[in-house]
Every structure is written in structure tokens, then in C-alpha cells.
């Protein structure tokens, strides 16, 4: 969801002649572009200024926006017969650009005609968007696939998803007779597949959103539990590594799944029998029985806000969290050293073979880790030099692949074997560090706060997509919104209590949403467009049908792992 946890992307456009450091928050446009970029549909409660001052448009401008929204539903974006007339469009100073996270940013007009993002900013935005919760499960995925196989799978999946993303970017240019400059990818799907394409894209988009929200709930429960445990142990001078299989050194690493059949440990802790205070704490601070419910009282009210604009201000925490994880992994690897042995097919007591048949679990995780296909057109629209889109996309994917390789390889290679087996690597690699570890505690605090600010944004997106399509209003009533939020929160609580396996949740949701957006739609649209132009050849047909088969197999095989 991808990554769903760090997007607040901006959709301004202009052609520039002079370079100026626009920065990712500087949204500018050329007045002549205003007509080509309509319609805008921004609800007043969604307006947020780049200077962090909450704003509302006038009632008159709001009414005009609603009329523009009505015009936009009467025809496809390429059909200019029903384009909103000039007198309906708000003045430039009243126009805002919609961000995928549900907020809006005010346009800044520059008559000089510059203001699009540089390639560096575009590359960073793509990298930042893809960096999500999947990064915590990459080391576990490498363990499931085998060290050598895991590295090869990461590289191959990066190349495959890059090609499919390239096909998404080029999909608009395959329709020569239509003006597709303002189209997004759902518009392309609707053009080729009609209402089925529109509703199926909505369905798979909701799968990725709700899957991400469930993963967030499981992780927030985990991080909140370990944070409370760290504070309690610090106050009472309890060493939690004494009651669990761990290494005996200044940088302890634990194996929570030892004695639980290799499954993630969902219990809280083990205390000495005569420690009444600790027993009471264990009773009321349990990872699966109590903590997931504590989050309900905190997050459910936030989901009912009409606008998530306040939370969008904390998106920079996503970048900070990833950078801190890179620092943490590097520091631990330097202190622990590398522990590797190579056995191609036969496992040993402490090491896994280089080739394991559970590698599809890693492909499922990576499908979501490399997932950006539903919003890549939006991100690249802001690129200053459109001719560099493909180059910048390739560079961004290369950086994402290197980041995943860096995290996964360092965690796997530095995991202390012996005395612990590589099979002890958890689906969330932070679980391999005791709650008393200060650096891991800081990482959990960072991630907990960041996820608590992103979670309402994901809920808002789910509300916009589902209620907006069904009722034509993203906030039909507090009752409708509350019912939807209770269903989403309930799903998160149930999974946190009974299936707190983020690796499993990520690979299922990744394979499901990737089936449509990554594998089927890009390949099928390319085949149809070539067939319409009578340029379809057997090699191209076979290759893209093979990609579709890979996507279907990737989903099916997840249920047998």
C-alpha cells in the first residue's frame, strides 16, 4: 500500500523555463492551465494551507465546486462537450488542488510559468510513498525464501513491478484520438473496461486500504504494548530477557516464537509467581486481550472527523521513521556482526537453506511493498520535465529496491546464529529486540505516533471511496460514517486478537490488490490498445499473458503457504 502511510501528494501543474527550488510543498500553476485542469471538487472542510492555517472557501465557491462536481459525472474527462463553463469555475485565488490523502492545498499563481517539481523531488516523493509497513516484514520474507533466493526475488519483483508501473504511465499515451492530459488511472480503466473497470478498481483499492488499516492496528497494538512494557519494566527494574530465549551480551536479541511452534508469540510476558504487581499489570496490559481494545477509545473518535487535514501535517514522520529504522539496523549490524552459513537445500540447527519453497510469501509481501501503480500518474504529473518521467521512475524503483535489500540483508545477516536460529526472525523484525532495548523503544514510539496520525487519513480515504460512490456524499450522516468506522475498527481488533501476523496480512492484501493494479490491468490494457492499433504480436501477447498468470498464481499460492 504500497505505501499508504506517507502520502500527502500535490497535484499542481505548470511548464517552467527557469528553475527555482519548489520543494514538495510548493504548489504552483500557470493561469492558462486552469481551464485544462478542471473540474476541482474540494469540500470546504478539506481545505488546508501549506502554512498550516486551516481555511475554508466561501459558500459561493463551495456551491460552484459542487456544480463542477456534477458536470464531471456527466461524461468522461476526455469529452470536452460538458466541460464546466467559465462562470462556474471559482477564481484562481479560490482554487485548491486535491491531495490523495483527503486534504487540499491552495494554488499559487506565478505568471513566470514555473513551479513544477524537479526530478529530485519527484524521485523522493515516489520513494517516500512506497516506504510503508512492508519494510518491517522484509527480513522475515527473506528468511522464508532463503537468503540467496530472497535477494533474487526482491530484485526480480522490483523489475517486474517497475515494468508494470511503466505500462501504467504509458497507458494514457496509447489513446491518440483522446485528450488524456487530465486523466488518472481509474479513468483509463473505465475507458477500456466500462463500469466494471471503475467498480473493480474501487474494490481492489478498498482491499489495499482496509488491509493497510488492519496491519496498522496490529502494529499499533504491538508498539503500544511494548511501550507500556518498557516503562513498567524500567520502573520495577525487571529484565524481560531472563524469561525468554535470547542472546547473552550487551545487545540482546530474543526469539519470541521459541516454544510456540514457530508462530508469532501473542502472549504478553512471564513473571515470577510471587510478583503480584507484575501479575496485575500482565492481566490488564495484554498484547492480544486488552491493548487492541484500548486503541478503540483513542482512534475511533478520530475516524469520525469530517476532515483529516490536521493529521496530514505529520506526514514527515513517515520519512523520519524510515531513516531511523535504517540507522537502527546499521547500528545493530555493526554491534552484532554477520552470522552466515550457506546450505542450498538442507536446513541446519541454526541456519535456513538458501532455496526454500516458501518464497511466494515474500512475493506477496513485495507486491504491496512495490505498490504505487494506482497513484503513479498523479505523482508524475508534477514533474517539471515530463520527458524524464520514465528515468525518474526507474531511479525511484532502484532506490526502493536498494532500501529493501539493505534492511532485509542486514537484519538477516546480523541475526546472531548461533545461539539463535535464523527461523526466529519475526514477521515484525522489531519483535526480535526486547522491550527494554532503548533504541528499539525509540523506533516503536516513532512508528506508533506516525501510524496514529496516518490511520485517520486511511479511514478518510476508505470513506471517500466507498460512501462517495454509494451515496454520492463522503459524509452522508454521522450514522453512516460511524457504522463504516466500526466495521473497519472491528476488523482491526479481531485480527490483532486472533491473527496478529503482519507478514500474513500484508502478503494476502498485497497479492489481492496487486492482482488487479499491478498485473492484470496494465498488461490487459496494453494488449487491447495494441490490438486496436493492429500492432499486437505473438511475443508481446505471450509475455503479457504470462505476467497476468504470474499475478493470479501469486494470489492463489498465498492460501497454500
Swiss-Prot record:
InterPro entries documented for this protein: AA_transpt_TM
Membrane side Lumenal: residue ranges: 141-146, 226-283, 335-356, 416-437, 501-507
Result after altering residue 68 to A: Abolishes association with the Ragulator complex. No effect on amino acid transport activity. Abolishes the interaction with the Rag GTPases heterodimer complex
GO molecular function, a single term: L-amino acid transmembrane transporter activity
S-S bridge residues: 255-424
Residue interval(s) of motif CRAC motif: 457-463
Cellular component, GO annotation: FNIP-folliculin RagC/D GAP; late endosome; late endosome membrane; lysosomal membrane; lysosome
Assembly notes: Associated component of the Ragulator complex (composed of LAMTOR1, LAMTOR2, LAMTOR3, LAMTOR4 and LAMTOR5). Associated component of the Rag GTPases heterodimers (composed of RRAGA, RRAGB, RRAGC and RRAGD); this interaction is independent of the Ragulator complex but depends on the nucleotide loading state of the Rag GTPase heterodimer. Interacts with TM4SF5. Interacts with NPC1; this interaction inhibits cholesterol-mediated mTORC1 activation via its sterol transport activity.
The name this protein goes by in its record: Neutral amino acid transporter 9
Native species: Homo sapiens (Human)
